[in-house]
Design a protein with these regions (language model features):
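Conserved NAD(P)H cofactor-binding loop of Rossmann-fold oxidoreductase domains
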Residues: 93-98
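Hydrophobic/aromatic anchor residues within beta-strands of the central parallel beta-sheet
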Residues: 54-56
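Conserved hydrophobic beta-strands of the Rossmann-like cofactor-binding core
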Residues: 4-7, 87-91
């Protein structure tokens, strides 16, 4: 049975490259994206071209109030797309960077960083 990985922030950067690498190792994937559906669809197409299954779902990891709805969506997708009820592992990759010196970082920027990375 193929393993299924859920990769947050899987539409670009490290998440994208992790998705592509796992696909070549025989993993099927659920990847998330925040805004750029087209980029996520490109990753899904590349994963499928390598012979793995993949689906992309929207998720803003900074909005913890949306997690229950996201979990419900994953529970729907797993049997529909993969014939399973659970995924095997999580790559918790989604995140942001504040490109400023700490002293120049606003409280709002710092709060957003903490919301996404730690909450």
């Amino acid at each position: 049975m193929r393993k299924i990985a859920l990769i947050t922030g899987g539409s670009r950067g490290l998440g994208k490259h992790t998705a592509l690498a796992l696909a070549t190792q025989g993993c099927d994937l659920i990847l998330t994206y925040q805004q750029n559906r087209a980029a996520a669809d490109e990753v899904v197409s590349a994963v499928r071209a390598s012979g793995a299954q993949a689906v992309a779902l929207p998720l803003d990891v900074g909005r913890s109030q949306d997690f229950a709805a996201f979990a419900a969506r994953v529970a729907e997708v797993l049997p529909q797309q993969f014939g399973r009820t659970q995924f095997d592992f999580l790559v918790n990759n989604a995140g942001i960077g504040i490109h400023a010196f700490f002293a120049d970082t606003s409280e709002a920027q710092f709060d957003q960083l903490m919301q996404i990375h730690l909450k």
